[in-house]
Structure formats: C-alpha cells, structure tokens
C-alpha cells in the first residue's frame, strides 16, 4: 500500500483559515440568523425559570400559601409549550443549515477534482480525496450549524444569567462569576493540545480510508498474490497508530471535562458557603444558576475546542480547493473557447488532425530527468501511426502530450499548424477518442455508458455505434441487452465486453484523433478478432496513435514508430522495418516465436 505523505497543517487557530469557507456559509445566512433568534428565545425562558422558582419558594412554599399557584402553573405550562415549539424549529433549521453547508462544500470539492489534471490523480490516493469529499465536509457542516446553535444559546444564557444574578444579589453574583477566568485559561491550555492531536488523527484517517479502498478495489490481485496477510498487517499498523492517537485525545478530554466540572462544583460550593447572608429563595435561585451556568460555559469551551480541531478539516478542504489544474488556459483562450462547464462551441474551429512535435523537451512534474529531449515528429492528417517499444521507452508520454494531459517544458506541439496551447483543452478533448487497456465504465446501463461518448445521442445512434465495433452481437447475448447494468467500474462485465463498449463509446463521439493505448492486449483472441475487424474502419480518415502490445495487430499501420529512451530510433511501414532487420525486426520475431510456442503448448494441453 502506497504511503502518501499528506501536507502538515500546523497553523494556530486562525480566522484567515475559516474565512476561506465563508462563501459556502453565506447562502445559509438567513437560516442561521433564524436559529440565533430561536436560541435567544430558548435562553430567555431558561434564564426566567430559576427566578420563577425563587418567587414560588418565597411566596408559596415558605409561607405555605396556595395564593397565585394557578397563575404560576399556567406560566410554567406556557413556557414548556414555547420551548417545545422553539426546539422543533431550531432542530429543523439546524439540519437545513448543516446539509446546506456540507452540500455546497462537497459540490465545490467534486468540481475542483473534475478540473484537476492527470498528475494530481497519479500522485494522490483515492482515500485522501474521499476523506476530503465526505468526512471533512460533513464535519465542517455539522460544526457550522450546531456550533452556531449551541454557541448562541450558551452566550445568551450566560449574559442573561449574569444580569439576573446581579439583579437578585450582586455579592453572590461576583462569587459565581469569579470562576470564569480559571475556566477560560483551562480552555486555552487544552484546546492547543487537542488541535495538535486531531490534526494527526485526520491524516491517519485519510491513510486508513486509502488503504481500505486499495484493499477492496484490488481484492482480486490481493487474493491471486496470496497477500491477504501482508495487507491485513499493513492496515493493522495504520489502525494501531490511529488508536494510539485516539487514546491521547481521549486522555486530554478526560482531564479537560472533569476539570471544568470541578470549577462548576466549586462555584456551587461557594454559593452554599455564602448562604448565611441570603434567604432561602435567593439561595435556590443561585444554586440553580450555579449548577446550570457552567453548562453553557462548558459548551462555549467545547465549541471553541471543536473549532480548533475542525480547523484541520477546513485547512485540508481549502487546500484541495486551491489546487491548481495541471493545465492552465490563457485568458484570451478562455474568452474565445470557454471552459469545461461553459464552452463557447460557436467559436470552435473544426479539428483536421495534422499533429507535429517541434523540438519538444519534457519531464514529468515529479521527475528529475527528461523523458523527451528536442523531440521532433510530424503525423499528417488521417495517418495511422503505431508506437512500439520496450516498457518505459516513452510511448505513453507521447500519447499524454498529444492529449494535452501534460504540456511540453520546451518546444511546441502543433495541431493543424498552430500551437495547441492557443486553443482550449476542451476543444481538443471534444475531438479525441481514447480507448485504454483497462477501460473504465460508469455505474449504469450499457446504453448509458455508450452515450457518454455524446450525451445527446439517440438510442438508434448508440446502437449503430455498437454495430460498427461489432459489440451489438455481444450485447444481444446479455440478459437485458443494452439495459444490462455494468456495475461499479464495469465489474459485472467481462474484460472483452468492457473493451467493446469503450470502443463504441469512443466511436459515438466521432473523434478526429483516435488513441488506442494497448486497447486489445487484455482481451481474448475471439474478441480481439472482432476488434481488429473494426479498427481499420474506425481509423479510416482519422489521425490515430496506437500503442501496440501485440505487434501482429499493427502491420497495416501507415507508419510504425519504434521508441527508445524518448527518441524515435526507427520509423517506417511494417514491410520497410522488417527489411531493415533492426530493433523492430527483433521485437516482432521474438514475439512471433513466443506466440507460436504458446499456441503449440495450448494445443498439446487440449490433446
């Protein structure tokens, strides 16, 4: 399991950090204001109840009088009804605010992920991105909504209780209020330590989510490698680390909360110790306030601690939202061509398919050495170009640059005679068909997956695309035909079925540039024969780059490029290269012998 080093977020409690998510909170402003007003009403009732109790003791219990008791009971009944209504509405509003904030942040995170380049996905574990999208956004929404509610009630109650205590007996009020300063100092002391531990827990949680995701998605590989024990031990190490820091967090809170309770108990004891100077009614009022006063004070302390702890989540989410895409368009390009979510297709020129590399030098963002150096290549419109070479020779790099998943560090890549950076990435991708060795299908039906090639395509066009690549007969054998569910990632279909569907999807887009990245290497012989019948028709009139694993499949290519260490060492047709008896000749004959040997062994096993 890959060990991804997350960024350390060790900033102290800072409004600047929280300011970054204010745009997501502002749409819930009215809801949060309503919550605050309701909390004022709730706090007002809570402050009034001890005074009502003191009045009852003084006028009814001590003199043993029933005079006015009916009115008191009526007032209590009304207050209970009011509190019930308040609670019903603030719970409703709190849930609205929480889900509203979480949804806004979650959508923004997902949108940012859609805009980020391939390199970000290559270096960032899925678990990290999942944690940002789910757990972090949920925690922020929860704190914003319920934090405002709890904090509002606590502040209003504290202010109201202090005013009421000074109004009833100012000396006792001073005694109770004297414990606030020690409580504030304790809160400051503990919240720094809790914040530090929580940040570590957030990082470990991301690693844990990533490891779990890797274990599930790679289940088949794990089982075939008999690596269950190794994966379990690695996951156990991560959970042990999480448990260790969770225990530290529990210890901090187990000291902090009882300490706060002790301060509250001390205030109650001081009140009782001073009872000789007051009557029973006033003592009852102050005992009520002393006992309940420290609940809101503790709430405030707890909310501040939670804000400090959740700042790590805010930092991570805002860090992702500030990630820059690997490819950044110039302003003039955006003005003319639009962006992914607001394309200006009326300004798009037709793409013809002439592609030229001129003095291109390139290294990957995390690489130290150039993969390509002063690389030159011209592929004319409609050319079927096959790329072959050993692993690591630079085949996929050429394709990545053609697709503009990355851009050259020096030199330029021309499409139809112009540097492709002068036009938008979306313009290029809309004219591009890309079929991978391991195609990805989305959850949904086969029909829906093919339609991703062109979302406005009719059912007839979807089915015609399937016929072109000979996928229609395979789909017809499935129980529900085109309405068959593909499953997550296409897991309910065979590799060959997924490959055929991905071909149909690419054809439906009617691209002018076609990329086949070892697209037939993972299919069985029968499916490969179907695909080979379709490929020549698919590539006709289109500029095509085919990274080939089986060299026998590219004999009809217009030009074959043999790549080694980022340089083209041979080029020509199959016949021309075989006559040269060079690198391509060696690769082809070696592979031919291996395939022939496998065929003989297979026939012997059948016999």
Region annotations inferred by a language model:
Residues 22, 27-30, 118-119, 135-144, ...:
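An intracellular "coupling" helix at the cytosolic face of ABC transporter transmembrane type-1 domains
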Residues 2-11, 99, 107-131, 135-137, ...:
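Short intracellular "coupling" helices and adjacent cytoplasmic loop segments at the cytosolic face
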Residues 17, 25, 90, 94-98, ...:
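Juxtamembrane loop-to-helix connectors within ABC transporter transmembrane domains
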Residues 31-32, 79-98, 145, 149-156, ...:
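Alpha-helical transmembrane segments of multi-pass membrane proteins
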Residues 62-74, 164-178, 248-316, 320-324:
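Helix-loop-helix
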Residues 32-89, 166-171, 280:
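Transmembrane helix-loop-helix hairpins at lipid-water interfaces of multipass membrane proteins
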């Amino acid at each position: 399991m890959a060990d991804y080093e997350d960024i350390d977020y060790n900033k102290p409690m800072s409004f600047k950090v929280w300011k970054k998510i204010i745009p997501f909170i502002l749409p819930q402003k009215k809801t949060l204001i309503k919550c605050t007003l309701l909390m004022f009403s709730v706090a007002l009732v809570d402050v009034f109840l001890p005074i009502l109790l003191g009045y009852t003791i003084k006028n009814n219990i001590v003199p043993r009088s029933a005079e006015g008791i009916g009115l008191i009971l009526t007032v209590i009944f009304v207050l209970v009804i009011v509190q019930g209504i308040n609670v019903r509405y603030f719970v409703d509003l709190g849930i609205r605010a929480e889900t509203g904030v979480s949804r806004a942040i979650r959508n923004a995170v997902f949108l940012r992920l859609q805009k980020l380049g391939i390199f970000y996905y290559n270096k960032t574990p899925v678990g990290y991105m999942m944690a940002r999208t789910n757990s972090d956004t949920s925690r922020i929404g929860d704190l914003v909504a319920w934090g405002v509610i709890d904090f509002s009630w606590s502040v209003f109650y504290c202010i109201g209780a202090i005013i009421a205590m000074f109004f009833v007996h100012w000396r006792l009020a001073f005694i109770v209020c004297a414990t606030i300063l020690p409580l504030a100092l304790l809160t400051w002391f503990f919240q720094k330590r809790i914040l530090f531990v929580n940040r570590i827990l957030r990082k470990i949680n991301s690693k844990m989510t990533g490891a779990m995701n890797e274990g599930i998605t790679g289940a088949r590989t794990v089982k075939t490698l008999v690596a269950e024990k190794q994966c379990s031990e690695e996951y156990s190490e991560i959970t042990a680390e999480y448990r260790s820091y969770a225990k530290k967090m529990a210890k901090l809170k187990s000291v902090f909360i009882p300490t706060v309770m002790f301060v509250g108990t001390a205030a109650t004891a001081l009140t009782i110790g001073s009872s000789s100077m007051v009557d029973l009614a006033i003592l009852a009022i102050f005992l009520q306030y002393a006992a309940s006063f420290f609940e809101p004070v503790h709430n405030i302390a707890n909310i501040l601690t939670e804000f400090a702890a959740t700042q790590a989540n805010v930092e991570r989410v805002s860090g992702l939202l500030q990630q820059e895409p690997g490819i950044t368009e110039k302003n003039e390009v955006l003005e003319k061509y639009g962006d992914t979510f607001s394309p200006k297709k009326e300004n798009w020129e037709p793409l013809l398919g002439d592609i030229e590399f001129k003095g291109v030098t390139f290294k990957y963002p995390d690489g130290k050495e150039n993969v390509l150096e002063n690389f030159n290549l011209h592929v004319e419109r409609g050319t079927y170009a096959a790329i072959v070479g050993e692993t690591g020779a630079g085949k996929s790099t050429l394709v990545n640059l053609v697709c503009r998943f990355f851009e050259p560090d020096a030199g330029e890549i021309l499409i139809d005679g112009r540097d492709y950076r002068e036009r938008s990435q979306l313009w290029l991708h809309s004219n591009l068909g890309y079929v991978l060795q391991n195609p990805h299908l989305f959850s949904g039906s086969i029909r829906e997956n093919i339609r991703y090639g062109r979302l406005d395509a009719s059912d007839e066009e979807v089915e015609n695309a399937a016929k072109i690549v000979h996928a229609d007969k395979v789909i017809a054998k499935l129980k529900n035909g085109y309405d068959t569910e593909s499953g997550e990632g296409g897991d309910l279909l065979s590799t060959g079925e997924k490959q055929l569907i991905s071909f149909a999807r690419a054809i439906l887009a009617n691209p002018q540039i076609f990329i086949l990245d070892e697209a037939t290497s993972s299919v069985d012989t029968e499916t490969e024969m179907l695909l080979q019948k379709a490929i020549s028709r698919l590539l006709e009139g289109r500029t095509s780059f085919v990274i080939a694993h089986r060299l026998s499949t590219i004999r009809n290519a217009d030009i074959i490029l043999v790549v080694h260490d980022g340089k083209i060492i041979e080029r020509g047709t199959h016949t021309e290269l075989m006559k040269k008896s060079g690198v391509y000749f060696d690769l082809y004959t070696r592979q031919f012998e291996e395939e022939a040997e496998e065929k003989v062994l297979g026939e012997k096993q059948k016999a």
